Every structure is written in C-alpha cells, then in structure tokens.
From Swiss-Prot:
Recorded name of the encoding gene: bli-3
Biased composition range(s): Polar residues: 1-11
Species, as recorded: Neurospora crassa (strain ATCC 24698 / 74-OR23-1A / CBS 708.71 / DSM 1257 / FGSC 987)
Pfam families: Pyrid_ox_like
Inducing or repressing factors: By blue light.
Matching InterPro entries: Split_barrel_FMN-bd (IPR012349), Stress-Dev_Protein (IPR052917), YdaG_split_barrel_FMN-bd (IPR038725)
Region feature Disordered, mapped onto this chain: 1-24
Protein's name in the database: Protein bli-3
Superkingdom of origin: Eukaryota
Length: 209
C-alpha cells in the first residue's frame, strides 16, 4: 500500500489549498483550543458517530447525543444499547469518528479516537437520564425496563486521538460579504478559525487532567 498522497495539480510555490492557509489558526494556546472545542461539542450535543460495520466493512454513521465529557473535555461519553449493531462494530474495530455541526453558524468539529463499551453500573447510574426509557423500552420482565439497572444500558467511551474543528470569526453578514469579495477578487474567504489538535497535544492534555 503506497503512502504517497493524491495530487491532481502542480501549483508551484503557491498554496494548493489557499482556504486552509488563510483560515488556519496556529497561534492559540492548547488550553483554549481544548476548551473552545469542548464548549462547542457540549453546547451542540448531537453528533454523528461513525464506525466500521462489522459485517460489511463499510463506514456507518448514526446520530448520537453526547452524555458527558471526561479528561478535561477531550474524552466523550454516549449512552448505548449494548445489544445494538454499533457495539458489534466497536468490538470488531475500536476506531471511531465523532462529528458535530452547527448548521446556523457553519461551525463544525471532527474527533478521531478509539472507543470502548463500558457496562460498569456506577458509571451508567452517574450519567443515566430517565428519557432513555423512550429508546430502550420496557420489556415487561422486571429486568429490561430501560432503567439504570437494565443490563442493556451501557456507555460508549470515546478517547480522543486527534481533533479538527472550525469556529466562526464573523456573523452571517460578514461571511456573505467575504465570500462575495472572494468570488470577485479570487482571494480566499476568511470566515473560520480552523484548528487542529495533534495526538501529542491530546496526550499532553490527558496526562494533566
């Protein structure tokens, strides 16, 4: 398998991806990068969780609500039915992606990591929400009732490895104006702060939280 990337153009000494170069935010300290990302994820709550289907090998996404964060905001917890297909996927391949989008502002986040399925009742009870009963149902056997002691109720813990995200720097009027200017001048629009959190930065953060 070749490690060479894809290219369809030679731009010489000009940036091949001028939008990224114009918006990449590399001067922000790590604590701000983490805190801004964590705030964005918790405020949006709903994400798309992508796993590799254990039967077909294809990527599969589904909407999941963020239940809580750990390790100073970098690790994510989600409620899960332990008998669902996604737990089979994660047993087969622990690699996972979690993405968030604010469709109003255009802000987004993508978290790559590894996931584990946790059935520890203390953790389940800590983050249990009565609304989960609507998704688990009560099977009427006195055990599988959708409550915190229901063995089907588990937690998916996602440990971040890397993250990429974008937060808005302008309101909608400013964005439209900047994009319009870009169409006329060919200058890339500067509408977001693109930030990257490396594997080394994640490890450094986790060691102190």
């Amino acid at each position: 398998m070749s490690g060479q990337g894809f290219s369809n153009a030679d731009t010489g000494n000009k940036p091949a991806d001028p939008y990224k170069q114009a918006n990449l935010d590399t001067e922000v300290p790590l604590d701000q990068k983490i805190n801004d990302l964590s705030s964005f994820m918790t405020s949006n709550k709903f994400s798309m969780m992508t796993t590799r289907d254990s039967k077909t090998g294809y990527l599969l996404s589904r909407c999941m609500a963020l239940a809580a964060t750990e390790s100073g905001g970098i690790d994510l917890l989600f409620h899960t039915n332990t008998e669902s297909g996604k737990t089979d996927d994660l047993k087969s391949d622990e690699h996972i992606n979690i993405s968030f989008l604010n469709s109003t502002t255009g802000d987004w986040a993508s978290v790559s990591g590894t996931a584990s399925i946790v059935t520890d009742r203390d953790l389940v009870r800590k983050h249990y929400n009565p609304h989960l009963k609507a998704w688990f149902g009560d099977l009427g056997d006195g055990v599988h009732d959708g409550g915190p002691e229901d063995p089907r109720v588990g937690v998916i813990r996602v440990k971040m490895v890397t993250a990429h995200y974008a937060i808005s720097t302008k309101n909608i009027v400013g964005k439209v104006a900047d994009v319009a200017q870009g169409v006329i001048t060919g200058k890339p629009a500067t509408v977001n702060k693109l930030r990257e959190i490396s594997e080394q930065e994640v490890q450094s953060w986790r060691s102190s939280h």
